Amino acid sequence: MAASRLPPAALTLKQFMRRQQVLLLYRKILRAIRQVPSDSDRKYLQDWAREEFKRNKSATEEDTIRMMITQGNMQLKELERTLALANS
């Protein structure tokens, strides 16, 4: 029998799609943070985002990951609203 070409820890399709959602959210948050006018606030928010994603990196429960993505999207929308108000 031939050995599988996939590494033993290959992601399932569902895990791969979730991972893509998380990475997209992370990139969107970092892009939004770039628009923060204050250097110190921008640095604080970048560090906060990085630490939050690192802290939750080991999460494997599907429901937990989905909940964190939802919370992240809500926080992103709040940040975007705050930036829009600050710029108007």
UniProtKB/Swiss-Prot annotation:
Residues 1-19 form a transit peptide. The keyword Oxidoreductase does not apply. InterPro entries: Complex1_LYR_dom, Complex1_LYR_LYRM2. GO terms for biological process: mitochondrial respiratory chain complex I assembly. One of its GO terms (cellular component) is mitochondrion. It holds the Pfam family Complex1_LYR. It is found in: Mitochondrion. Keywords: Mitochondrion, Transit peptide. Belongs to the complex I LYR family. Involved in efficient integration of the N-module into mitochondrial respiratory chain complex I. This is LYR motif-containing protein 2. It comes from Mus musculus. The gene is Lyrm2.
